[in-house]
């Protein structure tokens, strides 16, 4: 459950390290984002010579949440941290690598490029 003002780790090599959610996309009164949802983020911490810099406003896909994800078979999956992958306007990842595991739920939300770059799909 990601809402406005939530800080997230960045799970790609775009150059950003920490981002803050400033808007959850999808409806005027939408409060929370879960795995696979697109949010608008502000870059709070970035590495030198990265593709993005501190203060940039971008879109991102939530790939990990500390809140439980319930599956149709009754199982539950949760992660240690909240993480996102920065995307461009064509919904393609900005980075060329993804770090850490991502859940299968991204496939249902048509983020196939992120699934293919990820080292592990849970």
UniProtKB/Swiss-Prot annotation:
<dbReference type="GO" id="GO:0070180">
    <property type="term" value="F:large ribosomal subunit rRNA binding"/>
</dbReference>
<dbReference type="InterPro" id="IPR005745">
    <property type="entry name" value="Ribosomal_uL14_bac-type"/>
</dbReference>
<comment type="subunit">
    <text>Part of the 50S ribosomal subunit. Forms a cluster with proteins L3 and L19. In the 70S ribosome, L14 and L19 interact and together make contacts with the 16S rRNA in bridges B5 and B8.</text>
</comment>
<keyword id="KW-0687">Ribonucleoprotein</keyword>
<dbReference type="GO" id="GO:0022625">
    <property type="term" value="C:cytosolic large ribosomal subunit"/>
</dbReference>
<comment type="function">
    <text>Binds to 23S rRNA. Forms part of two intersubunit bridges in the 70S ribosome.</text>
</comment>
<dbReference type="Pfam" id="PF00238">
    <property type="entry name" value="Ribosomal_L14"/>
</dbReference>
<dbReference type="InterPro" id="IPR000218">
    <property type="entry name" value="Ribosomal_uL14"/>
</dbReference>
<comment type="similarity">
    <text>Belongs to the universal ribosomal protein uL14 family.</text>
</comment>
<keyword id="KW-0699">rRNA-binding</keyword>
<dbReference type="InterPro" id="IPR036853">
    <property type="entry name" value="Ribosomal_uL14_sf"/>
</dbReference>
<dbReference type="GO" id="GO:0003735">
    <property type="term" value="F:structural constituent of ribosome"/>
</dbReference>
<keyword id="KW-0689">Ribosomal protein</keyword>
<protein>
    <recommendedName>
        <fullName>Large ribosomal subunit protein uL14</fullName>
    </recommendedName>
</protein>
<dbReference type="GO" id="GO:0006412">
    <property type="term" value="P:translation"/>
</dbReference>
<dbReference type="InterPro" id="IPR019972">
    <property type="entry name" value="Ribosomal_uL14_CS"/>
</dbReference>
<keyword id="KW-0694">RNA-binding</keyword>
């Amino acid at each position: 459950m990601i809402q406005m003002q939530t800080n997230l780790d960045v799970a790609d090599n775009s150059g950003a390290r920490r981002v803050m959610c400033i808007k959850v996309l999808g409806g005027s009164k939408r409060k929370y984002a879960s795995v696979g949802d697109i949010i608008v983020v502000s870059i709070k911490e970035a590495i030198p010579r990265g593709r993005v810099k501190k203060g940039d406003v971008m879109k991102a896909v939530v790939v990990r949440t500390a809140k439980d994800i319930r599956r149709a078979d009754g199982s539950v999956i949760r992660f240690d941290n909240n993480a996102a992958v920065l995307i461009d306007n064509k919904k393609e990842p900005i980075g060329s690598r993804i770090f850490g595991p991502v859940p299968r739920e991204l496939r249902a939300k048509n983020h196939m490029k992120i699934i293919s770059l990820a080292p592990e799909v849970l």
